[in-house]
Amino acid sequence: HVRYTNKNWFIAAKSVLGSNLTQTSMLGGYGVKAIDKLTGEQEYASILNSSSWLNVVYGQKWKPGIFLGYTKNLGTGDAVTKLYGTGTDVDQVVMAGAELTYNVAHWKFGLEYTLSSAWYGSMDASNGKIKDTHSVCNNRIVGVAMFMF
């Protein structure tokens, strides 16, 4: 995580690489890679995910800003039969947003537009990666009036 601020600029970025990141409210999970036929005991392989984002805001009274984000499912690295978790059929997600806020003492008024696109597909059992993807897009507009004390 990096962050830079001064009188006019706010710049922040973060990148995460991890396995089974569902406990951090991110995409991820695990897959069953082996089942002992005698005891029924299962072996698991975690889904590896990478996620990065960048946020840049400029100004004092009027503050335009942009947000860019990307998440990628890197698979399990092992052959798996079934996946458990959050968004296990998502290959990648791209997010881009623009915002404009007006800031005065104790008040913030703003408008934000965000476009998100997720590529869904089916699991490749040889490595837990997602194949045969198609994208779904979401448009979001948010308005805010915030009193700060």
PLM-predicted stretches and their roles:
Residues H1-V90, V94:
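Detector for outer-membrane/organellar transmembrane beta-barrel domains
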Residues S135-F149:
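Outer-membrane beta-barrel "beta-signal"
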Residues H106-K108, T114-N127:
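C-terminal beta-signal and adjacent terminal beta-strands/loops
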Residues F67-T71, D91, M95-A105, E112-S116:
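Short, loop-centered acidic/histidine patches that primarily coordinate divalent metals
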Residues T5, N103, S135-C137:
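Solvent-exposed loop and beta-edge segments used for protein-protein assembly and interaction
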Residues V2-Y4, S52-Y58, A98-Y102, L111-Y113, ...:
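Residues on the lipid-exposed face of transmembrane beta-strands in outer-membrane beta-barrel proteins
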Residues I130-H134:
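Short proline/glycine-enriched turn/loop segments at secondary-structure junctions
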Residues A12, Q60, G65, Y113, ...:
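Secondary-structure boundary/capping motif
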